[in-house]
Amino acid sequence: MLEADLFFNYLSVERRFSKHTIVGYQTDLLQFSNFIKDTYEVEDIREVSHLYIRSWVVSLMENGIDPKSVNRKITALRSFYKFLIKTGVVDKNPMLKIQAPKISKKLPEFLDDKKMDALFDNMSNDGNVYEQARDFLILDFFYRTGVRLSELIELKIENVNLHNLSVTVTGKRNKVRQIPITIGFKQAIEKYLKLRKEFLNNLSMNCHYFFTDNKGNKMYPVFVYRIVKANIKMVTTGKKKSPHILRHTFATTMLNNGADINAIKELLGHSNLSATQVYTHNTIEKLKEVYKQAFPKA
């Protein structure tokens, strides 16, 4: 579909969407295209009505797709039709009659201080083994900076400024932000960099990325996910064991220790404050616990 190719190019060049997001949009639009073709024998995007789209949404829900995933697919299709209107391919937008299913708000899961202490106590970082130092620093990096998985993978050596005690991160839509680090964290990074240099020299490798896999190459998402999951599962029975739980932990820890929510928003790279405000719910729950301890008979 020519229109789709132009749309994906538009997302990449003008909107600066990440490759991960574009691949997701491609998958969602292909799924929709196959649905209307198989169900209604429609291949021309100009012939699609809002009734076809509603039917697709219903089929997704009936097949057990969770509302959050359905909303993502609707967002992809909504963006596509906005593009088609903008480029004059269609003159009516059927998405205007489509409502996204409501999502029950869930508080972000995080690890409390005791679990974080146990997490790092369980990990070995005393020796001179590169892989151990790397794995330890990966989890520590997520926890101390709140970066996303994709941001950590794309981090390069020059992005970590130990002189100025800051990390430069390129986030969604190529938005650049700086995250401060402590002197204590600087020392952990220096130890890692020393082992990293020896490790790459032994492999005769020259990798510009800050973290590498076991072969000295750029890491990939599943590689990092496995490292994080393997260690987090040692301290929690919760369902969430992904790198994102450490991002949630970073934000919650900052807020619980008095950080301004607008500052947390900037550190996380959120575009809107509403995305950051979800962490205030966790703080309220903590305040309730403190209150009960102070006034047990209240």
Language model: regions and residue ranges:
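Conserved catalytic core of the tyrosine transesterase superfamily
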Residues: 1-298
